[in-house]
Amino acid sequence: MVPHITTSISDSPLDVAALIGAAGSPEAGGIGVFVGTVRATPAQPETDRAVVRLEYEAHPTLADETLRALAHDAATKWDLIRVIAIHRTGSCELGEPTVVIACSAPHRAAALEACRWLIDELKTSLPVWKKEIYSDGSSWI
């Protein structure tokens, strides 16, 4: 079976429900989902400043290629039916989704394992950079 893979680096707000729905399939026994959102606590716990929003920048071509390759690797390794992997760029407000990963498979274990692997790989290898914005300044993470 050839998996259906959808990836994107997007400067538009993410429609989480639509993206999860797109991962569904009559052959799927489960969909593993991860939704990353903007939180008020900073990445560095020693920082006592609250995050107001995040700003993401990406290397457009390389980020697209990397995300697609990671999604393909996950689909192959776990025999997935569908893979959705979308990452935001631009300014993102508190609570706003910044990344959506949805993997469907015949059985839940594969869907969940693939989803976990994909977000972990994305965090270490995707050329997307994050800046925390505070009320009194900013910091690249």
Model-found features: residue ranges?
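N-terminal, polar/charged subdomain of small-to-medium soluble alpha/beta proteins
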Residues: 1-98, 106, 110-141
